[in-house]
């Protein structure tokens, strides 16, 4: 699952990206850096710190960034928005890596290759402070299965300099996706020593988060995100899962031209 390791930037602006895009029709460039404390892979009981750069170019409804990839997001007058994105899944390795999720404990499981993906998004800001979003993520390469996510965002505080938001997200995968990340087939069982396991399709994670964005001036801003994730029964009992709940903390600073 791509939300850990190299996809650190996903956690940086995800709660604000859709809302910001809807409010800004100009063109701008943002660069920055962030650091994240997170498990070495989804289900690991070992944590690691990682730093990563951030880049985003946005012109009206078009964008290119390290969070989602390249895409288009259109807002309707009633707060509804639709988007389509071409992005990637970083994959997972069976050794220690700075680029991907992974740990040497997974030796014999093989690598989950980096895959090109497309994401279809629909959301609705029902009020200035409450909105929900759903998306479908499909692989274009490396048939790794489908993902389906539903998210609810609530803005607790918003003024000229600060925004505080809480969110919850339920993540689903079909049988192929869940087995890619949490299943153990015959060959993997022989090579790794893990028992065989079939995860099946359905819910694979639930996230709860609170995040804060602060504007120091017209160009500099900061961000902090604390996220708690729980893994449901179908992936909790996988032999690759050592811990079925974990925290992720992300902090970053950004400069907008």
Roles of regions detected by a PLM:
Residues 1-28, 44:
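Cleavable N-terminal export/targeting peptides
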Residues 21-72, 81, 176:
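Short glycine/proline- and aromatic-enriched beta-strand/turn motifs that initiate or cap beta-hairpins
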Residues 23-29, 49-51, 60-62, 78-82, ...:
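Outer-envelope beta-barrel architecture signal
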Residues 31-36, 63, 98-102, 125-133, ...:
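Flexible, solvent-exposed coil segments and beta strand-coil junctions
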Residues 31-37, 66-68, 84-88, 120, ...:
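Transmembrane beta-barrel strands of outer-membrane/channel proteins
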Residues 39-51, 95-114, 199-201, 234-239:
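Surface-exposed strand-loop-strand hairpins of Gram-negative outer-membrane beta-barrel proteins
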Residues 52-54, 152, 244-257:
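Outer-membrane beta-barrel "beta-signal"
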Residues 73, 138-141, 145-221, 229-235, ...:
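Outer-membrane beta-barrel transmembrane domain signature
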């Amino acid at each position: 699952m791509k939300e850990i390791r190299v996809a650190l930037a996903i956690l940086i602006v995800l709660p604000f990206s859709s809302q910001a895009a809807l409010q800004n029709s100009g063109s701008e460039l943002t660069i920055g850096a962030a650091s994240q404390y997170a498990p070495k892979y989804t289900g690991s009981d070992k944590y690691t710190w990682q730093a990563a750069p951030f880049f985003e170019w946005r012109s009206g409804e078009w964008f290119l960034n390290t969070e989602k990839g390249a895409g288009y997001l259109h807002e309707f007058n009633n707060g509804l928005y639709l988007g389509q994105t071409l992005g990637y899944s970083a994959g997972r390795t069976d050794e220690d890596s700075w680029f991907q999720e992974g740990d040497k404990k997974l030796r014999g499981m093989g690598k989950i290759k980096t895959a090109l993906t497309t994401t279809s998004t629909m959301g609705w800001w029902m009020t200035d402070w409450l909105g929900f979003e759903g998306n479908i993520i499909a692989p274009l390469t490396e048939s790794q299965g489908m993902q389906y996510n539903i998210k609810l965002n609530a803005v607790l505080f918003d003024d000229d300099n600060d925004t505080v938001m809480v969110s919850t997200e339920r993540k689903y995968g079909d049988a192929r996706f869940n087995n890619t990340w949490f299943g153990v087939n015959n060959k993997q069982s022989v090579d790794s020593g893990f028992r065989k396991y079939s995860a099946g399709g359905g819910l694979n994670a639930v996230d709860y988060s609170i995040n804060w964005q602060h504007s120091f001036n017209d160009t500099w801003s900061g961000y902090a995100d604390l996220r708690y994730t729980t893994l449901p029964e179908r992936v909790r009992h996988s032999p690759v899962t050592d811990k079925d709940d974990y925290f992720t903390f992300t902090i970053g600073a950004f400069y907008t031209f």
